[in-house]
């Protein structure tokens, strides 16, 4: 159990997808203007990562890995296209659920919801799972933790950006300039977790 808690804490804080690897920055910067929208997208990314990492773990171990189907047959060259296909299917299902049951959030996320399919944070989580050779329970914990870490980062940035509306930001830094600086400072703060030995 201690191993899984360590993996979860590492995925959320030490190896944060947004602030340690800078993955998923397009939606991270574009949707972080309001906390409510950022939280909704964070939940969507967490759900997609929490489902797609274990689902792709099963596909990788049962179909793509060397010798999984037939001894001597290695289908790992199909990793990228297969992983993206599984992620796309999961995002489509999530999009239909949000459209049906949460139309306000669906409209607020707009084009960024289908773009979760090609969000490099999602693909990065799946790729790290395959590269680090996580087993199925580890992939569940890692997928959920990576999503929670990305959500924590985008909600924190949205909170900072909402506060900055009332700050006296120099004209040359308004908009994305101060957002990049804020993201960099947040990343520096999260680097302090790198010294934590888990």
Curated annotation (Swiss-Prot):
Task: Please provide, in alphabetical order, the Gene Ontology terms of the cellular component aspect for this entry.
Answer: Gram-negative-bacterium-type cell wall; plasma membrane
How is this protein positioned relative to the membrane? Answer: Multi-pass membrane protein
Q: Which InterPro entries match?
A: NqrDE/RnfAE, NqrDE/RnfAE_oxidrdctase, NqrE
Keyword line: Cell inner membrane, Cell membrane, Ion transport, Membrane, NAD, Sodium, Sodium transport, Translocase, Transmembrane, Transmembrane helix, Transport, Ubiquinone
- Bilayer-crossing regions: 11-31, 35-55, 77-97, 109-129, 140-160, 176-196
Q: Mainly localized where?
A: membrane
* Top-level lineage group: Bacteria
Q: Does the keyword Ion transport apply?
A: yes
Q: Which GO terms describe its biological process?
A: respiratory electron transport chain; sodium ion transport
Name the EC number(s): 7.2.1.1
Catalysed transformations (reactions):
a ubiquinone + n Na(+)(in) + NADH + H(+) = a ubiquinol + n Na(+)(out) + NAD(+)
Q: Which Pfam families match?
A: Rnf-Nqr (PF02508)
The UniProt GO MF terms for this protein read: oxidoreductase activity, acting on NAD(P)H, quinone or similar compound as acceptor
Q: What class of enzyme is it?
A: translocase
Compartment list: Cell inner membrane
Subunit note: Composed of six subunits; NqrA, NqrB, NqrC, NqrD, NqrE and NqrF.
Please state which protein family the record places this protein in.
Answer: Belongs to the NqrDE/RnfAE family.
**What does the record give as the function of this protein?**
NQR complex catalyzes the reduction of ubiquinone-1 to ubiquinol by two successive reactions, coupled with the transport of Na(+) ions from the cytoplasm to the periplasm. NqrA to NqrE are probably involved in the second step, the conversion of ubisemiquinone to ubiquinol.
NCBIfam families, alphabetized: nqrE
Protein known as: Na(+)-translocating NADH-quinone reductase subunit E
